[in-house]
Amino acid sequence: MKLLSVLALSATATSVLGASIPVDTRAEKFLIELAPGETRWVTEEEKWELKRKGQDFFDITDEEVGFTAAVTQPAIAYPTSIRHADAVNAMIATLSKENMQRDLTKLSSFHNRYYKADFGKQSATWLQEQVQAAINTAGASRYGAKVVSFRHNWAQHSIVATIPGRSPEIVVVGAHQDSINQRSPMTGRAPGADDNGSGSVTILEALRGVLQDQTIVQGKAANTIEFHWYAGEEAGLLGSQAIFANYKQTGKKVKGMLNQDMTGYIKGMVDKGLKVSFGIITDNVNANLTKFVRMIISKYCSIPTIDTRCGYACSDHASANRNGYPSAMVAESPIDLLDPHLHTDSDTIDYLDFDHMIEHAKLIVGFVTELAK
């Protein structure tokens, strides 16, 4: 996640849109979109300079010729009442902070998870092995559950785990797996414990919880369930764009996508004397799906919500939205109180609260079950 409000806390932060950035005409260029219809060719270093100044964007260099961003989404009726409380509560009871701490300790031990680096490839391979182990342990592969690599033209692959249902319509939970040190993207130390190791291991633990339900494991849920771990989010939502563009091109139907980007930092709220809460993103999301998410939180989670905005192209839910799929995003806190260590070598596990991450996992289990089962 790379968010304007976090960097706005610095008095030295200035608007890049009005700045003149020198261009090295010999360098490889990338086409980025900073706002709807506002595009610019930049070098890779200019991309990172924009990020350092707090400007988010889509990297649309590899977008298909003639692609048009969706301006409307299909009208989808979401449940207005809770229907599977017993099943969800049984799954929630299996969620483990110890599992998440173990997984995040390992995931953040890679030197970095930069999408072009060997470390990014290695971390993705390790993460996919954990997903496969969860599927194997549940016996779900016998009923068609699987995990696959979604390959890109860079080192790190995205990961897609699928639990088939009676319908091909998909309920998606996603998180980006890559990390970055913005001062030295390729070689710098970037543990990325919160951004976004926290989201990655939170949805992994939620997957384990969901796989405790035999109706889901045996493919008897009404809808298909997918868990995604995206590559290259920090470079312009690259992995999620590729996946959702592919889904659009192949006619896949997505009932809803819930994004989890940073799930573990609460100190900003505590220091302000605020009640620890979820940050509900209200811009560039589907309002009806977000209303459904609020219902899930009120039923299955023990903390309240605060409305907040994160801007254009701030994280992977925006890729779903851009391709016409309804998406929602729940952050660890209001955007202006996010973890200040993101994108540095100080983004370590020491600053995270695993009870808060469990609340996110409870949300995911409830979201998936109530929407898919």
Swiss-Prot record:
Enzyme class label: hydrolase
Pfam families: Peptidase_M28
CDD domains, per the entry: M28_AAP (cd03879)
Segment forming the signal sequence: 1-18
Paired cysteines (S-S): 310-314
Note accompanying the cofactor annotation: Binds 2 Zn(2+) ions per subunit.
GO BP: proteolysis
Compartments it resides in: Secreted
Role: Extracellular aminopeptidase which contributes to pathogenicity.
Family: Belongs to the peptidase M28 family. M28E subfamily.
Name this polypeptide is given: Probable leucine aminopeptidase 1
Species in which this protein is naturally found: Trichophyton verrucosum (strain HKI 0517)
Gene, per the UniProt record: LAP1
